[in-house]
Amino acid sequence: YGWLHLAGFDLPMEEIRNFRQLHSKTPGHPEYMETPGVECTPGPLGQGVGNAVGMAIAGKMAAAHFNTEEHEIFNHQVIVLAGDGCLQEGVAAEAASLAGHLALDNLTLIYDSNDVTLDAMADASQSESVFDRFAAYGFNCILIEDGHDLQAIADALAQARAQNEKPTFIEV
């Protein structure tokens, strides 16, 4: 919700303070048509990754059908933000594997690796390196050591946009 606020959507700080409160614009799971800037309702953890992969596939299909040498109409990047709990779900793993297989270079996944899930530390249910898992899926993987380094994040996003061979995974 912070990103939506900073991007200028109608999401004032008062709404952010009402996070997870009944009738707020900031429910526990983002909801399409309830929160400005939310393009789909992701529902259970991991589903947002599947939604993003679907959007990236749709973008590729639209580009193949409508783009010409004179007019590149569809050239957008799909960006998904995911946490530890999201990437522990099977739907996220399956969708990410497909994204790597299809070399969806219009997809960037930003992973907030704070080692916290909804009700426990991530190591209570996960022991593998998520970074290495996404490398195995075929992603271009970038590690940002300091999540407060905005220039490093901007540089990683620019690198993701510039490469045209595979999806990008940015661990923050």
Residue ranges and their predicted role:
Residues 1-101:
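Cofactor-binding active-site loop characterized by glycine-rich and histidine/acidic residues
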Residues 76, 104-107, 137:
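Short glycine-/polar-rich loops that comprise or flank the Walker A/P-loop
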Residues 161, 167-172:
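Terminal amphipathic helices with adjacent charged low-complexity linkers/tails
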Residues 83, 111-114:
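Cofactor-binding loop segments of dinucleotide-utilizing enzymes, especially the Rossmann-like FAD-
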Residues 67-74, 115-117, 121-159:
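Conserved thiamine diphosphate
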Residues 89-112, 169-171:
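A short alpha/beta connector and helix-capping loop motif
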